[in-house]
Amino acid sequence: MARNSKATDTPKTVVEKQSRKRKQDVEDAEESSSDEELQVEGILDDAASEDEESDSEDADKEDDEEEELEGDSDEEFNELLGEEEDLSDVDSEEFSDEPRDETASITDKLSGTKIRSYSNATEDEENEVHTKFSDGRPRIIKPEINPIYDSDDSDNENFNTIGNIPLSAYEEMPHIGYDINGKRIMRPAKGSALDQLLESIDLPEGWTGLFDQNTGTSLKITDDELELIRKIQAQESTDENINPYEPTIEWFTSKTEVMPLTAVPEPKRRFVPSKHEAKKVMKIVRAIREGRIVPPNKVKEQQEEEKYNFDLWNDNESETKDHIMNLRAPKLPPPTNEESYNPPEEYLMDEEEKKKWLEMEPEDRDKNYIPQKYNSLRKVPGYQEGLRERFERCLDLYLAPRTRHNKLNIDPDSLIPELPSPKDLRPFPIRCSTIFQGHTEKIRTLSISPDGLWLATGSDDGSVRIWEILTGRQVYKTVLVADDNTDDNIESLEWNPDSNSGILAAIAGEHIYLIVPPIFGFDIENNGRLRIESGWGYDTFGNKSKTKNSNIKVNSDDEDEEVEKADTNTGKKDVCKWFTPNTEQSQAGISAIIQCRKTVKKISWHRKGDYFVTVSPDSGHSSVLIHQLSKHLSQSPFKKSKGIIMDAKFHPFKPQLFVASQRYIRIYDLAQQVLVKKLMPGARWLSNIDIHPRGDNLLASSYDKRVLWHDLDLSSTPYKTLRYHDKAVRSIKFHKANLPLFASASDDGSIHVFHGTVYDDLMTNPLLVPLKKLTGHKIINSLGVLDLVWHPKEAWLFSAGADGTARLWTT
């Protein structure tokens, strides 16, 4: 009994002591605070614990009481907390008496004081920035407010103050949280299923059907909140003070203007009926008269008449028409003579054909049956393949795609251009009349003298031979490459265009040999030697410094080609050197030797015979070199060059230079020192170019089996692209006389001769007619015809092949 009485008396004593302690703490705090501010470190309980240490007697008594309370069992304390009715009575009794007033008085007293944490105050003061305004007054810039921790965007007061603790922690407890005073918020009683049904039927005011977990009750919305939601949904202003229908101020129409803005009299068309409207009205009237437009009242009459007027025997009205994109399945082909029950004898198979047909796979057979012969139709047995054929037919209809092919009603003859007959375009070479034999290796190059009497050939055996055209006899031979030198070959050679000089330029590896063969008369040979030797005197007496810089200055194009601005002396020393021949070479007719940096592949003379251009694809910026015979000068016109240079030629009569790289052809003006045009043939790898004698057309050959005709007056793309060779095209040449002929040589061993007429009228396109395909050279190691050259006067064609022979093709 004593134990029970002690347990019952404990809550009262605890409440009284706590109230007395709090009152004493507040009084001490009021006395100590001079500026009506109380700085509290932590919470009020911690401050109370510090005051308890000052009162030793009260502390001893409270320790004894706490020991007595600790002696009580946990079960009794839980029972004390679990008794809701007793606690409610105790709370009501205790807080209704004077102690309740005392606790309330503490909050009243604390309401007028400013409580702030000392640590927070020091942090705020440290983060403050003290500056001055422009007038000198002190200015304090306070730190920014953290929107996550220093503010709250919620307008409603939080009823349940459990913080971030999940509500699932209170599922097994009778309460759902604590209010701001620390009291428990008891879980509201749940009604039965019948009560919930009645609530769903009779909806209370502000019912939303939502459940508020913080309070444990249904969420209700007030009329003001509903009105706010309605305004937001209707996109109306939520502020009642804003009037959306305020009277507007008519700035322009408020004052009536007496005078008109424009006093122009009204035109007559405003009062006359419109002609365009009259046309539209007449168009509608004609449509009504013709019956294309039916008035609404007559439409109903026609529909009623059509109900009773129909074709009784017409069964196709219910069938719908196919869609415009519908493709019907093709019909089965009709049976042939082989499928007859009594076919002719020639349609029947013999024993070998039957055996071969049976051994073949079903997919490889041209027909899936063996023709049979019966004397009469009544002897024909049942067809065993009917089911299989129907199944295959279904597979074809189901799996085979169908496409619609529009038939072109075009006359095939209209697609073929109207070309003249080759018989009307004679003369042109049609047969091989002479074969020049003597070289042991393939002949890479050949050239014919300007007078048309001598043919020069260069071969991989290292020799240069000169032949008499009329007889086919060899008249001159010189060896430029030794037998032990396997790296160098005779790459190219060409006669000087001046027939009075008799100079032959031959290329062997890195050297250029200027030869005057002893086959001409004394005058021509002496003239050629003097022309070459005059350059030595120019070099000896040092007249180079007196001449102007003859470097070709070409503006850089899109591939960053620049002009080399070095002087002539440095240019000659850098790019190549001129040497005099030794005694043996002089006796062989060699008058000068030019040594370059890399292997030279192509050579071409200027029409006057004083300049010639060479191409070294591996020499980089000095790939193109221009040499002057009369001064023994060599210069590189370009400082930089992207791509590999394949060929270079002078214009027939203009001061222009054509340079062909792997993919592009550039035309440079040597007088104005600019890039004139850039041609884009569209080929992967160009091999050779040639210019028409009139200078307005160009031919290019490529290793990807193309022959490209460029009209220089038109665009930069080819006018015609000819693809008639089976392998790489090695050479392409125009006839230099007045004959409109050109030919191309390929590795397929064939030579194609074409007729190409260029008209004076710029509006007329060139006429290209294929004339003849010449074959005769053998293909050795996938190489066929390597070079071509036309006779300067006749319609004769010379060709050099990989079989070690040169051929003359005549009419």
Swiss-Prot record:
- Lineage: superkingdom: Eukaryota
Gene Ontology cellular component terms for the protein in this record: nucleoplasm; PeBoW complex; preribosome, large subunit precursor
Region named Required for interaction with YTM1: 386-422
Q: Where are the WD repeats?
A: 438-477, 485-525, 595-637, 640-678, 681-720, 724-764, 780-811
Q: Where is the composition biased (Acidic residues)?
A: 27-96
Show the ranges annotated as biased composition (Basic and acidic residues).
128-138
Cytoplasm keyword on record: no
Q: Which HAMAP family match?
A: BOP1 (MF_03027)
Subunit composition and interactions:
Component of the NOP7 complex, composed of ERB1, NOP7 and YTM1. The complex is held together by ERB1, which interacts with NOP7 via its N-terminal domain and with YTM1 via a high-affinity interaction between the seven-bladed beta-propeller domains of the 2 proteins. The NOP7 complex associates with the 66S pre-ribosome.
Indicate the family of this protein. Answer: Belongs to the WD repeat BOP1/ERB1 family.
| Record protein name field | Ribosome biogenesis protein ERB1
